[in-house]
């Protein structure tokens, strides 16, 4: 995980054209590259939901990448909310069903 003074956990919902375009796998790739832990999944309403925990810098960088998205996506909004930090020692970022 990138070094930072602050460990944060965020609940994030991304809306727009974000399903069927590789958005979850893009998210996993970016999160792992940044050393962020958590999960991502598709929602029935067409959005993508995730929880991300890591240094404040790494999570902010992930949010910035989510706002861009993979090539075929069209992100209309990224909602970010604070969550309590949990112990996820050694858990890799992954896809949930």
From Swiss-Prot:
Catalytic activity from the UniProt record: an acyl phosphate + H2O = a carboxylate + phosphate + H(+)
Keyword Secreted: no
First-level EC class: hydrolase
Annotated Pfam families: Acylphosphatase (PF00708)
Protein name: Acylphosphatase
Domain Acylphosphatase-like: 9-97
Assigned protein family: Belongs to the acylphosphatase family.
E.C. designation(s): 3.6.1.7
GO molecular-function term, one example from the UniProt record: acylphosphatase activity
Chain's gene name: acyP
Keywords: Hydrolase
Active site: 24, 42
InterPro entries per the UniProt record, alphabetical: Acylphosphatase, Acylphosphatase-like_dom, Acylphosphatase-like_dom_sf, Acylphosphatase_CS
